[in-house]
A protein has these predicted regions:
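N-terminal Rossmann NAD(P)H-binding glycine-rich loop of SDR-like oxidoreductase domains
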Residues: 2-22
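Non-catalytic, hydrophobic alpha-helical segments
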Residues: 224, 228, 243, 254, ...
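Conserved C-terminal active-site "lid" loop/helix of NAD(P)H-dependent oxidoreductases
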Residues: 221, 275-299
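Mid/C-terminal beta-alpha module of Rossmann-like enzyme folds, strongest
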Residues: 186-189, 195, 227-277, 322
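Catalytic helix-loop patch of NAD(P)-dependent Rossmann-fold dehydrogenases
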Residues: 91, 95-99, 106, 110, ...
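NAD(P)H-binding glycine-rich loop region in Rossmannoid oxidoreductase-like domains
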Residues: 44, 53-54, 58-92
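Glycine/proline-rich active-site loop of Rossmann-fold NAD(P)-dependent oxidoreductases
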Residues: 171-187, 206, 210-214, 221-222, ...
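Amphipathic terminal alpha-helices
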Residues: 21, 303-324
Length: 324
């Protein structure tokens, strides 16, 4: 049995979908549905049990993992990069992950967890996933800091030889519909095109950067989860790995791809970036994928335009269809 935390969320539900594609259905999902629309992400998936995240943690602390658990894929977290409640992030992202990691190590169970490219901060220290460089990283948000704390703790406890952490870069795609302001630019652009035939993008406020040329390592969720599930293979060594394409693309590239997939000519309004975002805004990210490639992990390779076309034409134009 495989446990997937955050299994009703964006990446977590896509992990369950990928497991289903490989014939795996004995899956326990851990999440908090509340009054959100996340339950739609589960409707087409096959799994054997659902646990509320708080009850699961109480059971974990009282008696450890379920005896038949063979692996834990821990995608559950507060993923809002603008969350300001540091205590909430410390509990939900740091302490919850620590408790789960300890239980997995004690039981000899494979542990795969989500770190983030937000740990790289402004990128001045590069984007190498060499664990020896962790101490040099300076995240720009409390979200990134919470992920950094987990990476440092995993290394300090000596768990990284038996666990795999993925530093996700900019993931977009199917099943992200519930994410509010954390929706990808691809989805936001589609919504604007669908409703107003135009898209708003932040104008550059930094000298030397043209409007729209801020780059990200955009990663299609279908590619991302193939690599995550591959890490269940014990032949993949433990450690922290970047998860991106290794190919930076601009926001303008992405928006143009959405217009093209929707069969429209680009029509863009440039708007000023809010003051509160300017100090923590990244102008360039790109995953160094050498380490992942050396251990045989699949490097996501779907071209941006092809991924956007699949997302827009296969799902968004079909009424926000879900995976499964």
């Amino acid at each position: 049995m495989i446990i997937v935390t955050g299994g009703a969320g964006f990446i977590g539900s896509a992990v369950v979908w990928e497991l289903n594609r490989r014939g795996v259905e004995d899956i326990h999902i851990v999440d908090h549905l509340g009054t959100t629309e996340k339950w739609h992400n589960l409707a087409n998936l096959r799994y054997s049990e659902y646990h509320h995240k708080d009850q699961f943690l109480r059971d974990l602390r009282a008696g450890g993992l379920p005896k038949d658990a063979s692996a834990v894929i821990h995608m559950g977290a507060c993923s809002s990069t603008t969350e300001r409640d540091a205590d909430y992030l410390m509990f939900n992202n740091v302490h919850y992950t620590r408790d789960l990691a300890r239980a997995c190590m004690a039981a000899g169970v494979r542990f795969i967890y989500a770190s983030s490219a937000a740990t790289y901060g402004d990128g001045s220290q590069g984007y190498s996933d060499d664990e020896a460089t962790l101490d040099r990283l300076r995240p720009m948000s409390i979200y990134g800091y919470s992920k950094q704390l987990v990476d440092l703790w995993m290394r300090r406890e000596g768990f990284l030889d038996r666990a795999v952490g993925f530093k996700f870069f900019n993931v977009f795609g199917v099943n992200e519909y519930h994410k509010g302001e954390m929706r990808s630019m691809a989805l936001k652009a589609w919504e604007r095109i669908h409703e107003h035939q135009r898209v708003k993008l932040f104008a550059s406020h930094r000298q030397g950067h043209a409007d729209g040329d801020e780059t990200r390592d955009f990663l299609y969720v279908k590619d991302a989860v193939r690599t995550v599930v591959q890490a269940l293979d014990p032949a993949i060594p433990g450690g922290i790995y970047n998860l991106g394409t290794g190919q930076p693309r601009s926001f303008l590239d992405m928006v143009k791809a959405v217009f093209s997939a929707a069969g429209r000519e680009p029509d863009i309004d440039w708007v000023a970036m809010p003051e509160e975002l300017r100090g923590q805004y990244q102008y360039y990210t790109c995953a160094d994928m050498d380490k992942a490639a050396k251990v045989g992990l699949a490097i996501p390779s779907t071209p941006l335009e092809e991924a956007i076309r699949d997302y827009v034409q296969g799902y968004l134009m079909a009424g926000r269809a879900h995976l499964g």
